[in-house]
Amino acid sequence: MKINLIYRLSNTNRMIHSQHYKSANEGDLKSAFLLIDEMVTDFSAFRKLSCFVCPVQKKSGNKIPLALASRIVENSAAILCDSVFLMNNRPGNKMIDRMFFEPEYSGHAPVGKYILVDDVFTTGITLKSLKTFIESNGGDVISAFTLGSSKTLLFEASKLKLKMLKAQFPEIEKYFDLPKLTIAQIEYLQRFSSLSNLHNLYSKSQFEKQFY
């Protein structure tokens, strides 16, 4: 199922300035619940929800998505799916680093309908890859929620959008798997006059990480 929009429950600025954010982001689950309770006071919209709720999570570190998913489950008829884990780290926080990040997931995802949960939506590649993982295991992802986001909440691209991107960059499939690209990634790509400029910027970013 194609998801056009991500739903945002609060905002990034408020989240990162919470007194609970640092410890929650570093892996303290109690702090993560305190953060969620501070930022989201009404879960009534989820009352009739009956599906799996799967957070973006690693085996250590940031517990905010897990806490948000847990609160949604507590206030609905949904079931928490906490058996899927992100296995690799993003190479950096710059947009260029996010462009070439390929998230890898592992774990058990029961067959059924899902909503996905993350703390912040930036490019959407982490959520997109989680969606792909769940769907490859027979699940059906119907929606996604985050606390905060970047400028856009648009998520998956239309066939027309992908066709226009390929017309702009005929060799783009040498660099990216088009169906995996999100709207935010596509809009970033369209800023470049050529793919070689994009690749050069990425190479420079990786060089700086290695030597500075």
For each of these PLM feature ranges, what is it?
Residues 1-48, 89-108, 183-191, 200:
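Active-site-facing substrate-recognition patch
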Residues 5-8, 131-212:
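PRPP-dependent phosphoribosyltransferase catalytic core
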Residues 46-60:
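Short glycine-rich phosphate-binding loop at a beta-alpha junction
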Residues 47-50, 111-113, 140:
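Short coil/turn segments at beta-strand junctions that form active-site/ligand-binding loops
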Residues 61, 65-73, 127:
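Short, highly selective alpha-helical patches that border small-molecule cofactor pockets
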Residues 73-82, 135-142:
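Structural alpha-beta junctions
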Residues 80-91:
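A short, structured active-site edge motif that brings together acidic residues
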Residues 112-136:
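A contiguous pocket-lining binding segment that forms or flanks enzyme active sites
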